[in-house]
């Protein structure tokens, strides 16, 4: 008899430190003054040339209302405080996810960690988490940039369906503030956060119904990581950057990636877009939910976005949006939900899930 797999619990955690746009206005006024000549404005540039062509590009058209704002629609972001670790956030989320699923450490067969980026260079967080949680099963790392949480869900569900593992704990984090210099305007749309969820057997016909995942190799040569010398400590550090072609490449591939994944997952699940109650995209920009709705031909009211609260939190976006939808009562049992995430130089993925009540962690404070 086939086993259905789905979420048993979902938890999110964010740093207490909230950084608003006034931080840069106060501490980096020259950067704000010259914002249109800096990274973020080059990344999300004002359209030039053929107006009709710009309007036909749904991603660019959705961006237009935000291009006169130097922060491109970002209002605030959560960032790690001095002495606060990504492992702290991950462990808090993981412990709550286990508690809400009614499980003890010994009930977990596998832990999958998707830390973007991990606490230590070259070594992922999975064994550190497993040790701290007292797990005795398998623990490994998975990374496919901003799609890590959804691909981890796909991986975990496959193991449960195959009866290889019964309970899989997935822990996801993003700490962009560690690699985004404050004098680089790209830091304006980046934040930190963590999430955790347990995947296990669910009632037949519920949980994950279909998946479709593709690579995003067409975005190779866009975002990158490099080494730089910290001016304060004179020590090497990792910094995030973007090439000149990044914005154009992301805009060109946004719609093809979304439609391919969404249609592929819907086909596997045997449903149509009209059957879906809520579309939970990862939302790395202020306009992404509107873009996604237009690309799939659905009403924007059927989408959810926490970008205004958290900015771009990479692989944590999808679980954060899903948690927000559930905690604000936008999901009911048996609702069909489309989950979608896209990462640069990594993967794009979509899932169709038939919702059931899950052990939901506490809503983050405002």
Show where each model-derived region lies:
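Acidic-glycine-rich active-site phosphate/pyrophosphate-binding loop
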Residues: 62-68, 117-134, 170-175, 229-234, ...
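Claisen-condensing/thiolase-fold acyl-transfer catalytic domains that form or cleave C-C bonds
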Residues: 91-94, 117-119, 128-131, 136-162, ...
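Short acidic, glycine/serine/threonine-rich loops at helix termini
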Residues: 18-19, 122-125, 153-154, 179-184, ...
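Short beta-strand segments
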Residues: 8-11, 143, 168-174, 199, ...
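Flexible, glycine-rich active-site loops centered on histidine and acidic residues
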Residues: 163-194
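Condensing-enzyme catalytic core mediating Claisen C-C bond formation in acyl metabolism
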Residues: 1-83, 184-252, 256, 260, ...
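Phosphate/pyrophosphate-binding loops at sites that engage ATP/ADP/AMP, CoA/4′-phosphopantetheine
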Residues: 66-70, 93-109, 260-277, 325-330
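Metal-dependent C-N hydrolase catalytic cores
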Residues: 48-119, 125-126
């Amino acid at each position: 008899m086939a086993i259905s797999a789905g979420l048993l619990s979902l938890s999110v955690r964010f740093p207490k430190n909230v950084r608003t746009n006034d931080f840069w206005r106060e501490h980096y006024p020259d950067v704000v003054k010259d914002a249109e000549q800096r990274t973020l404005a080059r990344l999300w540039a004002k359209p030039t040339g053929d107006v009709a062509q710009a309007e036909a590009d749904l991603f660019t058209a959705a961006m237009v209302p935000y291009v006169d704002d130097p922060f491109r629609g970002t209002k605030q972001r959560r960032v790690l405080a001095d002495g606060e670790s990504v492992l702290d956030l991950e462990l808090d989320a993981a412990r709550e996810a286990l508690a809400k699923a009614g499980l003890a450490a010994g009930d977990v067969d596998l832990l999958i960690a998707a830390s973007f980026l991990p606490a230590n260079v070259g070594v992922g967080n999975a064994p550190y988490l497993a040790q701290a949680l007292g797990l005795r099963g398998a623990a490994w790392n998975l990374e496919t940039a901003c799609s890590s949480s959804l691909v981890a869900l796909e991986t975990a569900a496959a193991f449960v369906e195959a009866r290889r593992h019964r309970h899989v704990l997935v822990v996801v984090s993003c700490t962009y503030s560690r690699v985004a210099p404050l004098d680089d305007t790209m830091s304006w749309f980046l934040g930190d956060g963590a999430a955790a969820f347990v995947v296990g057997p669910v009632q037949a016909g519920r949980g994950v119904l279909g998946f479709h995942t593709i690579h995003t190799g067409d975005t190779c040569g866009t975002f990158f990581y490099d080494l730089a010398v910290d001016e304060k400590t004179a020590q090497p550090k990792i910094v995030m950057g973007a090439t000149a072609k990044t914005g154009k490449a992301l805009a060109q591939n946004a719609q093809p990636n979304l439609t391919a994944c969404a249609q592929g997952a819907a086909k596997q699940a045997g449903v149509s877009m009209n059957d879906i109650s809520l579309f939970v995209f990862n939302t790395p920009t202020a306009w992404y939910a509107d873009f996604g709705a237009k690309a799939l031909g659905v009403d924007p009211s059927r989408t959810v976005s926490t970008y205004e609260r958290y900015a771009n939190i990479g692989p944590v976006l999808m679980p954060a949006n899903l948690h927000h939808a559930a905690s604000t009562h936008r999901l009911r049992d048996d609702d069909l939900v489309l989950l979608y995430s896209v990462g640069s130089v990594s993967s794009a993925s979509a899932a169709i899930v038939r919702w059931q009540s899950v052990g939901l962690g506490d809503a983050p404070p405002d």
